[in-house]
Design a protein with these regions (language model features):
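Conserved, mostly hydrophobic/aromatic
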Residues: 35, 39, 72, 134, ...
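Active-site pocket-lining/capping segments in soluble small-molecule metabolic enzymes
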Residues: 1-22, 59-122, 140-142, 149-186
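Active-site glycine-rich loop that binds ribose-phosphate moieties when present
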Residues: 22-38
């Protein structure tokens, strides 16, 4: 949004459509709405090989009449590259055991050029689907580019159905599940405790922070010079931290955003993301592996309580560094008018 104010920028955003649990997929698309609202001019997808997911991404833009161009990230996937990404657990990349078996067999049989055939086919399929272009990754050497160009020319006159048939043959796809991860579940409901917690905190937020009376009383209390006193300010901050940390994971950010995040604190995201998820989740799990992604929890809860528009529309500002370590209660009431 800041770049838009300066002008001269063509702003691109990343998007990962290769999500297979309902909540993490919903969270990705809800954030894409926000990115477009914030001023995205074009979209670049994560690297991936599931053409159905790319079709869904393009269909989403068409359905919502978004004019932004979308580009697909593509890569000639060799066994070495696939093994590297698996070894280093590159976040957000889906490479299935079936894909590894196909690549291993091709290497054994001396058919490694199939990686460039598939890349050429994927580029041409994306063109048929209405993608504006591709981001070609890991194809740097002139001989690699010439090989890719050779197969693009070879398949250029194929129709979409012919390309899809050849793609499926090269990946040995028979059930359409070969290029997607195995799911322990697709959809989950929020727990009763999550629903009760949301309802209680929502009631408290409305009563204590959004009602006209609360705003007036809060503004009157916190405009007093008392709170400029260091001991009083420290006591206030400590009181706020104790009351919120155990319930929502407060980290004294100074600019509480709970009302815009369904009372799931963005400070509990390892990356501190408030507007939605990164692209690195795997089946609802955070890329750090120690927790469920809070944005999946949030998307699941939003659907259950009819609040998906909040996650779709509300652009949450970054917390200024100078605000951190101050009382969000005081900052809230002084920034609002009764």
């Amino acid at each position: 949004m800041a770049a838009k104010c300066y002008g001269g920028f063509h702003i691109g955003v990343a998007f990962n459509p290769f999500k297979y649990a309902e909540a993490e997929r919903d969270a990705q698309y809800l954030k894409l709405h926000k990115k477009i609202k914030a001023g995205a001019d074009f979209i670049v997808t994560q690297l991936g090989y599931d053409m159905e997911a790319l079709k869904q991404a393009k269909a989403f833009l068409n359905r919502h009449r978004y004019p932004q161009n979308i580009l697909a990230c593509v890569m000639p996937l060799s066994l070495a590259r696939a093994n590297f990404m698996m070894k280093h657990k590159i976040a957000g990349i889906v490479i299935t055991p079936h894909m590894l078996r196909v690549l291993a067999q091709e290497k054994q049989d001396g058919r490694t050029e199939n990686a460039y055939k598939r890349c050429a086919i994927q580029i041409l399929m994306c063109k048929y689907l209405g993608f504006a272009g591709v981001h070609l990754s890991a194809c740097h050497k002139p001989e690699e580019q010439k090989l890719l160009e050779k197969y693009i020319e070879q398949y250029r006159h194929y129709g979409l159905q012919e390309l899809e048939a050849l793609w499926n043959a090269l990946w040995q796809v028979k059930t359409k599940n070969e290029l997607v991860p195995e799911l322990a579940y697709y959809s989950r409901q929020p727990s009763s405790s999550q629903l009760i917690k949301y309802q209680q905190l929502h009631f408290m937020h409305k009563a204590l922070f959004e009602s006209k009376i609360a705003k007036g009383v809060g503004h009157f209390i916190f405009k007093a010079s008392l709170w400029e006193n260091t001991p009083a300010a420290k006591a206030l901050l400590k009181t706020e931290f104790i009351s919120k940390q155990g319930v929502v994971g407060c980290e004294s950010c100074g600019q509480c955003r709970l009302g815009d995040t369904l009372y799931i604190c963005p400070e509990t995201c390892p990356k501190g993301l408030a507007n939605g998820p990164c692209g690195g989740t795997t089946l609802d799990r955070c890329e750090f592996g120690d927790r469920e992604c809070i944005h999946s929890v949030k998307a699941r809860l939003a659907k259950a309580v009819g609040q998906t528009d909040v996650l779709k529309e509300k652009l949450i500002p970054t917390v200024p560094i100078e605000v951190r370590g101050t009382s969000s209660w005081k900052n809230w009431y002084l920034a609002t008018e009764a």
